[in-house]
Amino acid sequence: MRRRLSVWAYPWDLADEGVAAALDWLRDAGFDAIELCPNYHAISTFAPRNLQRSIHYSEQGAVYFPARAERYGRIKPRVFDEPAVLGAYAQAAEHAASNGIELNAWVIGMFQPWIARAYPDTAVENAFGARSFATTCPASPDVQEYLAALVADLCDQYPVNSALLERPGHAEFAYGWVRERILIDFDPWTRFLAGLCFCENCLTAARTHGVDAVEVRERVARELRDRLSRRQESDDLEATIAARVDSDEELRGYLESREQSATRVVEGVQRALRGTGTRLSLTHAATGWGATGLRLADLLERIDGLLLPDPTDESDEAKRQAALARSARREIELVVMLWGSDEFDPGGPGFAARLDRIARLRVDRVGVYNFGLLRPETLRQIGGLVREALAK
């Protein structure tokens, strides 16, 4: 498989610069792939290279291609209201092909505040019965149907090589909250419990799995109240979960039902992509009990690509996931995201060490974040250094 240098991009930045001009620039800078988002979550960005829209502000997120409402079920896509931005995907498909650039879709999964607000029963709900409207729950059949329809709609319209699902599983505690105020320390186990969803869809899934879901919710709520009343010592989350599920069959069953719900999301998208020629990739899987419920071993026969954890911050897990993916019976493309910002000196030893770790993982694609948010000269410099690292 050819190693590719990619860049993550927003359609509004391509549209404002001119899609053809932007892709010409990327080609000349040595990039041969692009990860273009067809939908996005709530975001506020500042783009130094965008002469028309230095600030993009979206409180709840939107869909950024001309989605066809008749293809969807209960949840209808909330389409962005600027025709030029909606036209970016079609232009990107045309000009990417002529420039030898691979077009990939960067698809947001559960972090969809607009869906949670418009369809409150899809929102995450904690053990105390409080909803978070930042994210939707993967146990919702409507959410599963919507995400599959969205990806199929996109890939039926455009020649997308790979669709990467970002966070299609359960959200961690406080993920996506707006200017959150949390003034107490959460140890890993308390944070894990606080992030468990007990919406009606999750309770139904657990009951179907043979679990007394209400009893689990009540026990989690009691334990949370107790742990929140005083400071807790830090713990090894992986070891704690393993010990608890070994001694608590009901909790094990509940966590298993979470994993089944997350897996159903991936299965639904996989089915929807049949016949399109588009490969399916995902992010935030885990080799063990994970907060997202995406157990990698259960997904190897359903995916064609995997975004690995950060090889610096989570080096051991990145190595485990790479090894597991390579043991699969099908070829799985390994991808790494490389953040670029003024906090990183591309010419410094820290950045060089990061590139060395990426090279040793022997990944197939490195995506630099982000086309619009970096200075052009910084993006070009990072791209050149990545190219050198991949060639070693």
Locations of regions flagged by a protein language model:
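Hydrophobic faces of well-ordered beta-strands that scaffold small-molecule active sites
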Residues: R3-A9, D32-L36, L103-V107, A163-L165, ...
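Substrate-binding cleft of secreted/luminal carbohydrate-active enzymes
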Residues: L308-A318, V335-A391
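Aromatic- and acid-rich polysaccharide-binding/catalytic face
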Residues: L36-S44, A239-D248, A291-A318, Y369-F371
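Short, acidic/polar
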Residues: D13-D28, P141-L154, G288-E301, E317-A322, ...
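Polysaccharide-binding and catalytic clefts of secreted carbohydrate-active enzymes
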Residues: G129-G275, R279-L299
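Aromatic-lined carbohydrate-binding/catalytic grooves of carbohydrate-active enzymes
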Residues: F31, E35-P83
